């Protein structure tokens, strides 16, 4: 199992628009060309760091020495460690929660398996540590810590790495989204049709993949990276660019933390490969591939969940559902997620306009309204997948609940869109964007 040995060292950076070639340096897998003139607000970008650590990046190098492992340290974590060693007090010290907040958070965790779990409230109660707190609880409640003999301190350190490698300034692709997907995955792992077949390894893989599936997301989509000639797009040959990066980053953190170092090498290699297969399945461009295969299995009634391959396939489907389940939440939460993802689209559109690039589909705030985007997303992406998931679960209580929320939320967006058109005197179709437009915009499709 190879791993891209990288040093993540800064967020989205754009070259001067006067240059003939415009490119983007995304947080992750990036080599800076200079040490001076780095804007102070860029996360983890400090000129005193020795940028030679970023050199000699390879696509398939094995990690065999401590020196190589050190390259996997993210720039942000490297900076935090180095300034602490120099005796500099962090600018944002840890604020401890009072007992009232901790008590409320613990009470919420007692209901973590319910579909109306409010991840936004939970994130506030945990002072922005929803992902770490949730995963520590789930690893314990599923018996994974005992089964895999995981060290609690090492587990916590790894989870903090994952949480910190999400960009808090992203409206949508941030650690709260990862926590929301993880909570949904937990609910799906409890579905009776699936739960009785799952092994501890399946459960751990599902939770880890859900938590890390968008780690280090730059807040722009794959087409943006391709048209700006970003080096990650070249590295992964324009195929599942972000998903490959999320996977490689996850493996880097697993190895750096040594969370699984006590397990047999063959087992850790298998875990890394399966995590890759799960995370890569979230590529929206593969939606039809997975949907067609799921329909065929259900039609032929040939799913054998005692078979590891079939079980892994259903874990992929479960993760895909968890990743795009926002429209199936209650309206108050679903609406908030919709506004967040569209805000992220619009920010990308603003960047494209600023640098005289063609504005990507769904990213033009003047033309692409939130109701229109969401109606198309629900119609062409969410509904087909969740209908098949309901067939698989035998129309379980949770599946019926999700489809009910989906229908209600779609009606709400149609009503809002109709009101918008009445105000504008437009007779535009209420169907939303075409499916090919949605698939072109990875992430609209959150």
Curated annotation (Swiss-Prot):
PROSITE patterns per the UniProt record, alphabetical: PDEASE_I_1 (PS00126), PDEASE_I_2 (PS51845)
A GO molecular-function descriptor: 3',5'-cyclic-AMP phosphodiesterase activity
Classification via CDD domains: HDc
Positions annotated to bind a divalent metal cation 1: 177, 213-214, 323
Lineage top rank: taxon: Eukaryota
Free-text remark on how the cofactor is bound: Binds 2 divalent metal cations per subunit. Site 1 may preferentially bind zinc ions, while site 2 has a preference for magnesium and/or manganese ions.
EC number: 3.1.4.53
Required cofactor(s): a divalent metal cation
Binding, a divalent metal cation 2: 214
SUPFAM superfamilies according to UniProt: HD-domain/PDEase-like
Tissue expression per record: Highly expressed in brain.
Protein activity control: Inhibited by dipyridamole, IBMX and SCH 51866. Insensitive to zaprinast, rolipram, and milrinone.
Active site per database record: 173
Root EC class: hydrolase
Positions of the PDEase domain: 97-420
Gene Ontology terms: biological process: cAMP catabolic process; signal transduction
Signal peptide feature range: none
Reactions that this protein is recorded to catalyse: 3',5'-cyclic AMP + H2O = AMP + H(+)
Main function: Hydrolyzes the second messenger cAMP, which is a key regulator of many important physiological processes. May be involved in the control of cAMP-mediated neural activity and cAMP metabolism in the brain.
Family of the protein in this entry: Belongs to the cyclic nucleotide phosphodiesterase family. PDE7 subfamily.
Record's protein name: 3',5'-cyclic-AMP phosphodiesterase 7B
Gene, per the UniProt record: Pde7b
């Amino acid at each position: 199992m190879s791993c891209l040995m990288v040093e993540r060292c800064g967020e989205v950076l754009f070259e001067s628009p006067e240059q003939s070639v415009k490119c983007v340096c995304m947080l992750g897998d990036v080599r800076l060309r200079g040490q001076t003139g780095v804007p102070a607000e860029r996360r983890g970008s400090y000129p005193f760091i020795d940028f030679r650590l970023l050199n000699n990046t390879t696509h398939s190098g094995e990690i065999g020495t401590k020196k190589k492992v050190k390259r996997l340290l993210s720039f942000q974590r490297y900076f935090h460690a180095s300034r602490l060693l120099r005796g500099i007090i962090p600018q944002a010290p840890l604020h401890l929660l009072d007992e009232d907040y901790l008590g409320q958070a613990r009470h919420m965790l007692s209901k973590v398996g319910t579909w109306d779990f409010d991840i936004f409230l939970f994130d506030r109660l945990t002072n922005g540590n929803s992902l770490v707190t949730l995963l520590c609880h789930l690893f314990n409640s599923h018996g994974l810590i005992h089964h895999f003999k995981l060290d609690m301190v090492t587990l916590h350190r790894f989870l903090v790495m994952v949480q910190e490698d999400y960009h808090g300034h992203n409206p949508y692709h941030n650690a709260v989204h990862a926590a929301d997907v993880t909570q949904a995955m937990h609910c799906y792992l409890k579905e009776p049709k699936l739960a009785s077949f799952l092994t501890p390894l399946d459960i751990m893989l599902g939770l880890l993949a859900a938590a890390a599936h968008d780690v280090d997301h730059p807040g722009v989509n794959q087409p943006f990276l391709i048209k700006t000639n970003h080096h990650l797009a070249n590295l992964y040959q324009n195929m599942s660019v972000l998903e490959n990066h999320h996977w490689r980053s996850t493996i880097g953190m697993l190895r750096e933390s040594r969370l699984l170092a006590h397990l047999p090498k063959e087992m850790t290699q298998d875990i890394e490969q399966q995590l890759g297969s799960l995370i890569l399945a979230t590529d929206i461009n593969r939606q039809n591939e997975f949907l067609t295969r799921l329909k065929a299995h259900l039609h032929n009634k040939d799913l054998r969940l005692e078979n590891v391959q079939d079980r892994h396939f259903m874990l992929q489907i479960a993760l895909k559902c968890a990743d795009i389940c926002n429209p199936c939440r209650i309206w108050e939460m679903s609406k908030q997620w919709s506004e967040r993802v569209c805000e992220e689209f619009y920010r990308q559109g603003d960047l494209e306009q600023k640098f005289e690039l063609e504005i990507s589909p769904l990213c033009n705030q003047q033309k692409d309204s939130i109701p229109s985007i969401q109606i198309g997303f629900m119609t062409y992406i969410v509904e087909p997948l969740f209908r098949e998931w309901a067939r698989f679960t035998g129309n379980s209580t949770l599946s019926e609940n999700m489809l009910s929320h989906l229908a209600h939320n779609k009606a709400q967006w149609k009503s809002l869109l109709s009101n918008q058109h009445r105000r504008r005197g437009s007779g535009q179709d209420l169907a939303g964007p075409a499916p090919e437009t949605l698939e072109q915009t990875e992430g609209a499709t959150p």
